[in-house]
UniProtKB/Swiss-Prot annotation:
<dbReference type="Pfam" id="PF04362">
    <property type="entry name" value="Iron_traffic"/>
</dbReference>
<dbReference type="GO" id="GO:0034599">
    <property type="term" value="P:cellular response to oxidative stress"/>
</dbReference>
<dbReference type="InterPro" id="IPR036766">
    <property type="entry name" value="Fe_traffick_prot_YggX_sf"/>
</dbReference>
<dbReference type="InterPro" id="IPR007457">
    <property type="entry name" value="Fe_traffick_prot_YggX"/>
</dbReference>
<comment type="similarity">
    <text>Belongs to the Fe(2+)-trafficking protein family.</text>
</comment>
<dbReference type="GO" id="GO:0005506">
    <property type="term" value="F:iron ion binding"/>
</dbReference>
<dbReference type="GO" id="GO:0005829">
    <property type="term" value="C:cytosol"/>
</dbReference>
<protein>
    <recommendedName>
        <fullName>Probable Fe(2+)-trafficking protein</fullName>
    </recommendedName>
</protein>
<keyword id="KW-0408">Iron</keyword>
<comment type="function">
    <text>Could be a mediator in iron transactions between iron acquisition and iron-requiring processes, such as synthesis and/or repair of Fe-S clusters in biosynthetic enzymes.</text>
</comment>
């Protein structure tokens, strides 16, 4: 499997096997983010969608997730909603 130096975990890890999003952002994620970090983002994204009851048809919700994704993957910020609790 191809390796990538992951911006989130600051180490060489397995790359995402496909470009996860279209366009330049998708290329950047594919080149700079590991599969481990991408899977962690997908789990975190699910928490955000459920806790904030986001409607993914709305542009505002999509923009919110895009901003949170950038924070999570490239800035190391992983903030869970206040009301969230692990079961």
């Amino acid at each position: 499997m191809t390796k990538v130096f992951c911006k989130k975990y600051h180490q060489e890890l397995d790359a995402i096997p496909f470009q996860p999003l279209p366009g330049e952002l998708g290329k950047k994620i594919h080149n700079e983010i590991s599969n481990k970090a991408w899977q962690a983002w997908l789990a975190h994204q699910t928490i955000l969608i459920n806790e904030y009851r986001l409607n993914l048809i709305e542009t505002k919700a999509k923009e919110f997730l895009k901003e949170e994704m950038h924070k999570f993957l490239f800035e190391g910020k992983e903030e869970k909603p206040e009301q969230f609790s692990e079961i």
